[in-house]
Amino acid sequence: IVAIIYYISILRKAYSRLHEAMEKAEQANQLKSAFLANMSHEIRTPLNAIVGFSNMLPHVENREEMSEYADLIETNTDLLLQLINDILDLSKIEAGTFDFYPALIDVNQTLEEIEQSMQLRLRHNNVTCTFVERLPECTLYTDKNRLIQLLANFIVNAIKFTEVGTIRMGYRLLDPETIYFYVSDTGCGMSSEQCIHVFERFVKYNSFVQGTGLGLSICHTIVDRLGGKIGVESKENKGSTFWFTLPYRQN
């Protein structure tokens, strides 16, 4: 009898774990279904804008209006490329083919490249992006493209939620073995509850802002794979600071 009770207890625990796993799988499937439905809309919106303004452009004679249409095409092309890149990165993560190629890089030069790229992107916005904190010299053994992807994702996210103001980017050493990167903005900020879930997949706190809801989740994966930590500090209506740390290796 004792043996029967013991095995029944084991079966109940196994059933409970199975039921919990099935519920999580169902939630994941629902999220993926909602994601796919949302993506068809997210991709169609910039694509329609690109096609529409491209068709109108040959018939425009006013130079100022022509420049405006060209800027709109460029903006929507960047958005479409970001959407596609996020989806491709997710598929690589799921397939286990999300690769890294570390090498010794010049950190100041890399962040200056990001700053120049973002300033060009923001030339018609009421937002500035500035590289504000650095070491006189700094080399780091890491994947340059992934570092750029991390900071660019943070900055693009900040742009979405900052109508007017400043986005600041920088880095410093926390200790001899840890380097700390950050992107701060003066945007709308988030609640403490939102901060808890912001790095989860498919999370979007503003349905009017276009995107996959994958960018920050992908950042979390990159930082984890590089052996660092990631986080956010934010207050509603006060702005946000997204940050990550990496091992400070030079070989």
Q: Residue spans of the language-model regions?
A:
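Conserved catalytic submotifs in the C-terminal HATPase_c
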Residues: Y101-D106, R123, T128-C138, L174
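Short conserved segment of the HATPase_c
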Residues: G52, M190-F202, F242
